[in-house]
């Protein structure tokens, strides 16, 4: 048994399999950051912080001594509780293939959004500087006319190249922007196809972000450091329900300020 306490949950092996499957595919469907940043191997439940390799000057304890603290980024634990019906759980053992796992999917979606918001927008309470605030490139404004968006993306890629940032490059679009470029056409083709021809990388639907980002995916510029990857744990149960949660521990580091260009709506 580990500190997820799953062995104590009144959930059959078959039901656990379905719960994990729904959580995994919903999380992967909505998360975007992991597709464009480096993701570390999980450090394990005992991991509490990640070294930045830097030193912080502190007051010396006595004359003739120089003191420094090793700078580090603490890992934040993100937990999303959800409740499942025991009736729905037991239906799996009775052969049902349509148990209601909506609470699992809602929790997975919420966790994916929180992770992406931390990566791109930052999370000050957890000492995370997001890509937007860490970028040294001037943000570019997204035009109201979707037909002009490819020109702005081309400008962003040019800025990356002028800053000495090699490709490949990827473009992340918020849900609203992605819809606009998918539904608007020019010369008979969706704007999304025009963008695809411009970008030597992926065009990614990123529903958690605001606006858009153009960034390099060459590696070594952005680092999602995990303590424990997304896991499902058990809290309690009663005669009718089981209380579970999705959880991960992480921090995020930006190593290269010029490696991304934010696009603002």
Curated annotation (Swiss-Prot):
GO cellular component term, pick one: plasma membrane
Subcellular location: Encapsulin nanocompartment; Cell membrane
Highest taxon above the source species: Bacteria
Major location category of this protein: other
Disulfides per UniProt: none
The family this protein is said to belong to: Belongs to the encapsulin family. Family 1 subfamily.
Functional description taken from the UniProt entry: Shell component of a type 1 encapsulin nanocompartment. Assembles into proteinaceous shells 23-24 nm in diameter with 2-2.5 nm thick walls. Cargo protein DyP is targeted to the interior via its C-terminal extension; probably only 1 DyP hexamer is incorporated into each shell. Probably involved in protection against oxidative damage.
Protein name as catalogued: Type 1 encapsulin shell protein
Species in which this protein is naturally found: Mycolicibacterium paratuberculosis (strain ATCC BAA-968 / K-10) (Mycobacterium paratuberculosis)
């Amino acid at each position: 048994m580990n500190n997820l306490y799953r062995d104590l949950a009144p959930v059959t092996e078959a039901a656990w399999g379905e719960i994990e499957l729904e959580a995994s595919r919903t999380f992967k469907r909505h998360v975007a950051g992991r597709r464009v940043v480096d993701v570390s191997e999980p450090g394990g439940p005992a991991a509490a912080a990640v070294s930045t390799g830097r030193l912080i000057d502190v007051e010396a304890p006595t004359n003739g001594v120089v003191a420094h603290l090793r700078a580090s980024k603490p890992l934040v634990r993100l937990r999303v509780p959800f409740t499942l019906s025991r009736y729905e759980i037991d239906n799996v053992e009775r052969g049902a293939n349509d148990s209601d796992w909506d609470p699992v999917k809602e929790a997975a979606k919420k966790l994916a959004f929180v992770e992406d918001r931390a990566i791109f927008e930052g999370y000050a309470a957890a000492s995370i500087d997001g890509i937007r605030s860490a970028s040294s490139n001037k943000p570019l404004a997204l035009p109201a006319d979707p037909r002009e968006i490819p020109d702005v993306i081309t400008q962003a890629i040019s800025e990356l190249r002028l800053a000495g940032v090699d490709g490949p490059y990827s473009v992340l679009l918020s849900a609203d922007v992605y819809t606009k470029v998918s539904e608007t056409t020019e010369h008979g083709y969706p704007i999304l196809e025009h963008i695809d021809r411009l970008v030597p990388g992926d065009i990614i639907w990123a529903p958690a972000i605001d606006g858009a980002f153009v960034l390099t995916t060459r590696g070594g510029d952005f680092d999602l450091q995990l303590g424990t990857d997304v896991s499902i744990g058990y809290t309690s149960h009663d005669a009718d329900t089981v209380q579970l949660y999705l959880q991960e521990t992480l921090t995020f580091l930006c190593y290269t300020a010029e490696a991304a260009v934010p696009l603002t709506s």
